[in-house]
Amino acid sequence: MRTLTIFFISLFSLPLALNAQSVDEMLQKVSAAIEAGQNGQAVSYFRQTIPLNIDRTEMYYWTNVDKNSEISSKLATELALAYKKKRNYDKAYLFYKELLQKDPNNVDCLETCAEMQVCRGQEKDALRMYEKILQLDADNLAANIFLGNYYYLMAEQEKKS
């Protein structure tokens, strides 16, 4: 019985050990590709590590990536997209804010950041971002829809009170 228990424990823990090893190996490949100047390959390896262990991949980004390098924006975008897909809006917002620090007038990034704020329940901050988007791009559909709906609902609430 004891042998059988040990067998099952080792059987179930083996994939965890292999997963950790493969994440480390992939992150080493990311580092090697960055050092070799192969940014496209580095982003590809980085993207492959995210589903294996997103927390370890994020830690790699914060500790090993030069935030002033060209590739840091691409890696931050990958993490932002992954967290958005997992509906972890707090982390996605964090990475979109990181991207906005480098390019504060990037309309696409502002739009997604505002969307994350709505998902996080931060409508006032989203309102400010959508207003900034309209200053940069008056024809932005998402900003016009959000602001139109927001001001309509505010007027309706004011009528009721």
What function would you assign to each model-found segment?
Residues 51, 67, 98-101, 131-135:
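Conserved structural position within tetratricopeptide repeats
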Residues 35, 85, 119-120, 153-154:
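Register position in tetratricopeptide repeats
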Residues 23, 57, 73, 107-108, ...:
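Helix-start (N-cap) detector for alpha-helical repeat units in TPR-like alpha-solenoids
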